[in-house]
Amino acid sequence: MISSRVHSGKSEMKKTYYSTIYKPAEDSFLLADVLKKEIPKLIKVNSNLSLLEIGSGSGIQLQTARKLGIKKQNILSTDININAVKYCKKLGFNCIQSNLFAKIKGKFDLILFNPPYLPENKYDKEKDTTGGKLGSEIINKFLRQARLHLKKEGKILLLTSSLTKNINWQGYEKTKLTSKKIFFEELMVWEVRR
């Protein structure tokens, strides 16, 4: 978890540095819970499982995947936020600054994405939470690009919200793995395959 304590000097810089990174919340914890169930099953079949996380934020999913047995050298992550990239690198992960798959080469067994999924409104225009006017614009762009980076038998674990409208699942099969109602929405984690 990211520290927000402030003591002096360097700690003040840390507060500013970390304050720009999406911090784990209910959505992050729900996806981590799914990883705890899914990764052990996947590793039994493929001990050399490769993982790509788009939008790594604080690195919670990377840390979960590593603890569950995915080899560190088989984990790659991206984030559009350079501070998130630096933080994940400090945690020891291979992380690059990229807008979705723009700087990604290769194919992966497992792709994770906890996207910005809320519809934009006049009160919340944050890049790390809003996914466009309908909330689905970033997700749809991700789904269009992901097929080029997913191995034939690979799968995507994607988090969405009941508030997200018009997700284009064309060309994919999806299965809802879990859901959780919180406040004004329902969060869902989907297993997505080509």
Over which residues does each language-model region extend?
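S-adenosylmethionine
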Residues: I2-R5, Y17-K37, S56-I70, T78-R194
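Glycine-rich phosphate-binding loop signature in dinucleotide/nucleotide-binding domains
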Residues: L42-N46, I104-G106
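A general structural motif
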Residues: N46-N48, K72, E153
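Conserved class I S-adenosyl-L-methionine
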Residues: N48-G57
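Conserved "HGTGT" condensation-loop signature of ketosynthase/thiolase-family condensing enzymes
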Residues: I75
